[in-house]
Amino acid sequence: MNTKILDQLEFNKVKDQFTEYLQTEQAQAELRDLVPMTNPERIQNQFTEIQEMSEIFVEHHGFAIGSLRDISEPLRRLELDADLNIQELIAIKKVLQASADLSRFYADLENVELIALKRLFEKIEAFPSLQGSLQSINDGGFIEHFASPELQNIRRQLKACDDAIRQTLQDILKKSGHMLAENLIASRNGRSVLPVKNTYRNRIAGVVHDISSSGNTVYIEPRAVIQLNEKITQLRADERHEMARILHELSDQLRPHTAAIANNAWILGHMDFIRGKYLYLHDKKAIIPEISDNQTLQLLNVRHPLLINPVANDLRFDEDLTVIVITGPNTGGKTVMLKTLGLAQLMAQSGLPILADKGSRVAIFQEIFADIGDEQSIEQSLSTFSSHMTHIVEILNTADSNSLVLVDELGAGTDPQEGASLAMAILEHLRLSQIKTMATTHYPELKAYGIETQHVENASMEFDTATLRPTYRFMQGVPGRSNAFEIARRLGLNEIIVKEAENLTDTDSDVNRIIEQLEAQTVETQKRLEHIKDVEQENLKFNRAVKKLYNEFSHEYDKELEKAQKEIQEMVDTALAESDSILKNLHDKSQLKPHEVIDAKGKLKKLAAQVDLSKNKVLRKAKKEKAARAPRVGDDIIVTAYGQRGTLTSQAKNGNWEAQVGLIKMSLKADEFTLVRTQAEAQQPKKKQINVVKKAKKTSSDGPRARLDLRGKRYEEAMQELDAFIDQALLNNMSQVEIIHGIGTGVIRDAVTKYLRRHRHVKNFEYAPQSAGGSGCTIATLG
């Protein structure tokens, strides 16, 4: 895009408004180089970056990069094999530290969905070793003692010599204090000296380094410290040499990474620039506009960014609208409206937020041209007809259908009749070339052109006849009218004269009356639109309030739900502990008395009332497999309340069923158990093992033994089956069980071991003998 338009519309002044929001020199440089873009994807990406930055600020209000110097010159010097000075190394050190901080920030970032910024965050490289090396230089520009053993040794010697000199001079001060002009140790030419009164200069042996301006004081380096001062001078030279070597070494460490460090610095600067754009958007109540794909424009409540209290206006360029002609007198803000449109486009195409309301839409133009002769503009510049036409010729020779043309006072500066004809012909050429154009003029002849010509629309700036002042309100679709008669009348001109003037221009008066009616209708429409907008704003506020209340309610609901879940879990834990106690009592008593069985059943039913097993995955699965027929004797069932397996033995006259559940006989209603399978199905080979204890053949171990195969099971499924298996084994008075878990990755085996170790009814357990499965099978003794 041509750079001339940037000066004409004062775009650099707009860019200057962003400076206060930037912290890094890199971002300042990016702002200086910023120019409008013509690639919609690049523009949209920058808008996405701003939007994502706003989402970051929702979670982290204080997000900032920090103040960073531009390190492009130090990096260039590194590439030329030059060594960096301390300040340059500090600047790079700060960039590396900021890079590490930004990486940590991204790693900890939650509740924010990023796309454009994610690519930036993930391109940052960390250099912990370089950061460690650069810690030897502190931010004050001092090379720390630990930078090298040699430097540490030199500084240790320096301190020793300095202490020795100070002690020697202190001794002289005590002995010869009356000879001194001041009771202190001074320094001249980098050497420690004493201020001796001139009358005693021969009483203290040493080298004179200076004499005061009055001649009364002589600065003498006593002979006793000359050798020590010589040593200090040498040590200072050694220190400088060692520091230079350290700077060279640090520069060499940085040299291979210049490209990556430069990339980090660019990302930090660009992130700071995005942050600055968001802060501008927030402070100025700006927005990110939509991008149209057909050169349509819709600017809602758009404001001029350089004015202190700009009037907001709506402006649209529909697809079938090519030319807008703003007619009317030379006051009222026509030029400002031209610049407002141009600046909104330049800002948007530069990836900057614009001063408008949500719902605004911008087009993407390859070029924007302007001819603005601003007698009344922000920057005044006079334009003769010749220079005016020269600019118009350049525009007509260059502009095409992908351009936006802005012309102020088209055809001005020459004979009104010829100027109006010329203006009309130029606008017609632009219309036929399908070039989006906005032009201002005070020629009344162009009103008719705007009304009669397709794809052309009139517009004007509102004028308040009551106050005789312009309101700066843009009225699209309404041509401008002269207010001369009304102004003259209100200023006190004789009514007879005004009437005579109106009679002399009857035709124009009729047109003005029509325009006046249009203005009134437009003003009324705008008032209604403003009322609608106010209602929309109230609705938005209401919606926000409702959303806030909903979020607060959801938060309270989640807290109460979590509290309830904890209480339920405590109930379940208590119930499980009590069930373990019941099972242990059942196991301990080989002979049960009837009343004990009834008591145990009562306790189990009481537990069932406390624990809701409706969400148990095993029960849900069993329910899905329930046969679509009535239950019958011999069917396998699962008792819903306990999750225990049993078999139907008989049906009572009242419709209830008798079931054998382990050692216990139970009376159940039809809705208190789930049918698993038929007897015939039970005799068929099982494709998949379920939670059931299979009687094993007698082994040499005491008591019966059961086996559970967990191979191929998922962790959660295996643990559910193991838990039910142990419970059933205890109910069946098993003394020993086998759990086949295989070797595999060891996850199931370790889980089985952990489960058995904490189960109170498992006396001990061990892997099976090698011949019986080895570490792929665990034998547990119950008791």
Curated annotation (Swiss-Prot):
Stored CDD domains: ABC_MutS2 (cd03280)
A Pfam match: MSSS
A single BP term in Gene Ontology: negative regulation of DNA recombination
Cited Gene3D superfamilies: 3.30.1370.110, P-loop containing nucleotide triphosphate hydrolases
Transmembrane portions of the chain: none
Enzyme Commission number(s) of this protein: 3.1.-.-, 3.6.4.-
Coiled-coil residues: none
Domain Smr: 708-783
InterPro entries reported for this sequence: DNA_mismatch_repair_MutS_C, DNA_mismatch_repair_MutS_core, DNA_mismatch_repair_MutS_sf, MSSS, MutS, MutS2, P-loop_NTPase, Smr_dom
Keywords carried by this UniProt record: ATP-binding, DNA-binding, Endonuclease, Hydrolase, Nuclease, Nucleotide-binding, RNA-binding, rRNA-binding
Annotated binding of ATP, by residue: 328-335
GO molecular function terms noted in the UniProt entry: ATP binding; ATP hydrolysis activity; ATP-dependent DNA damage sensor activity; endonuclease activity; mismatched DNA binding; ribosomal large subunit binding; rRNA binding
Disulfide bonds: none
Protein role: Endonuclease that is involved in the suppression of homologous recombination and thus may have a key role in the control of bacterial genetic diversity.
Protein family: Belongs to the DNA mismatch repair MutS family. MutS2 subfamily.
Assembly description: Homodimer. Binds to stalled ribosomes, contacting rRNA.
Identification of the protein by name: Endonuclease MutS2
Organism (species): Streptococcus thermophilus (strain ATCC BAA-250 / LMG 18311)
Taxonomic lineage of the native organism: Bacteria, Bacillati, Bacillota, Bacilli, Lactobacillales
Recorded name of the encoding gene: mutS2
